[in-house]
Swiss-Prot record:
Organism: Bacillus subtilis (strain 168)
Membrane topology: Multi-pass membrane protein
The keyword Transmembrane is assigned to this record: yes
Entry's localization field: Cell membrane
Predominant location category: membrane
Full protein name: Uncharacterized protein YphE
This protein's UniProt keywords: Cell membrane, Membrane, Transmembrane, Transmembrane helix
GO cellular component, as recorded: plasma membrane
Tree of life domain: Bacteria
Designated gene of the protein: yphE
Chain ranges passing through the membrane: 8-28, 41-61
Phylogenetic placement of the source organism: Bacteria, Bacillati, Bacillota, Bacilli, Bacillales
Length: 67
């Protein structure tokens, strides 16, 4: 697998983490009644969003692949 395909899969995984973060925030805000569980789920969601943002930043600013 070449570098361009690896960057594509990292970007796709980052989008998956963003989707997981959105679903977790929805779950924590509208479906959970337990306060501790709300905090735990929303913390998980914000960590997913932070990690996905870092991955996207690295993929985008690493530049195009020379082939």
């Amino acid at each position: 697998m070449n570098l361009a395909l690896m960057k594509m899969w990292f970007a796709l995984g980052s989008m998956g983490l963003m989707f997981l973060a959105v679903a977790s925030i929805y779950l924590s805000r509208f479906k959970c009644q337990n306060r501790f569980l709300k905090i735990a789920i929303s913390s998980f969601a914000y960590m997913c969003m932070l990690i996905s943002g870092i991955i996207v930043f690295v993929v985008v600013f690493s530049g195009p692949v020379n082939e």
